[in-house]
Amino acid sequence: MESLWKLSYLLEPASLALILTAVSVAYASASRALDHGREMERNLDFSEASITLDRSQALMIPLASSCSLLLMFYLFSSVSHLVTAFTAVASAMALFFCLSPYVNCVRSRLGVGDPFVSRCCSKPFTRLQGLLVAICVGTVVAWLVSGHWLLNNLLGISICIAFVSHVRLPNIKICALLLVCLFVYDVFWVFFSERFFGANVMVSVATQKASNPVHTVANKLSLPGLQLITKKLELPVKLVFPRSLMGGLAPGSSPGDYMMLGLGDMAIPGMLLALVLSFDHRKIKDMSVSQDMPPSKQRKYVWYALTGYGVGLVTALAAGILSQSPQPALLYLVPSTLGPVMYMSWLRNELWELWEGSRPIINDKAHLLEV
């Protein structure tokens, strides 16, 4: 009975905010990936084309991630300034990518002119884009100075959406391979790394803070306002929500405690959602072209995957609460998202079509490798 009572912690404001944000970001990532692909096809502009993973790349991702994890575990204090600087640049670029469609939409609806100013990286650069760059850079600077968790989450969400939009899966075959490999990766580094390295590598890396290069420079130059600049930063590679959010605080928790979810636990399922959302829209388009085929009223695959993601995320949080120990989220998210999609496609006799995927658009800019 006590265990069931502990599950009420899932109704804390921090837990609910984490769940709702993660589900929304996973769907937003898939939707933005679909729109980005359409935009590239419509404009025949592949200078920002996506990378479509092949089998060898899917196998290399867990290995590369493991190497990065060990590097951060042993050498983080030595490279934290460099990592923070790289993350700041990537965050600004990702935020620009995410906000650009909204700026263009507002401009077109208001009929506001946006005169050409110059060329940047062989692309036209307008005044509104310049203003947006300033806003994005200002947001990153505000994060570097304050380290506020809301800004951290905003930048992390932007990175997640940009990643899913630019790194694609060609079919369920490669998707299943990637998810199973990352399933093993997550389980090993959370549950078994302590036996080999003397500490839980995943938890250690996820919870350590980076040194703030802005604070270091301000300190060396004895600049005024040094006390306003945070010394340590949570990098935007995870969502963080304070347990004291809106007055909620679980027994045994301190006001400084946070609930965390790694970006990979949103981005990897988001790649699956992007794949099935693209498949859903292609099926609808094929049916609209075919005159003798009635429009399908079947539920889209993306909703099965998204529902499974929500269920898997709640299950992962519940397991963490009941066990009082960190849980590998992909242990729950991989079967809860991939399973329903494969089962429903098998029932509809579309598993082979999803398994092999549609032929991608070949261009000299995109990195497309056929399996």
Swiss-Prot record:
UniProt topological domain (Cytoplasmic) ranges: 28-57, 104-123, 168-171, 280-301, 348-371
Topology in membrane: Multi-pass membrane protein
Name of the molecule in the record: Signal peptide peptidase-like 1
Pfam families attached to this UniProt entry: Peptidase_A22B (PF04258)
MF-aspect GO terms: aspartic endopeptidase activity, intramembrane cleaving
Source species: Oryza sativa subsp. japonica
GO cellular component: cytoplasmic side of endoplasmic reticulum membrane; endosome membrane; Golgi-associated vesicle membrane; lumenal side of endoplasmic reticulum membrane
Motif annotated as PAL, chain positions: 328-330
Keyword Endoplasmic reticulum: no
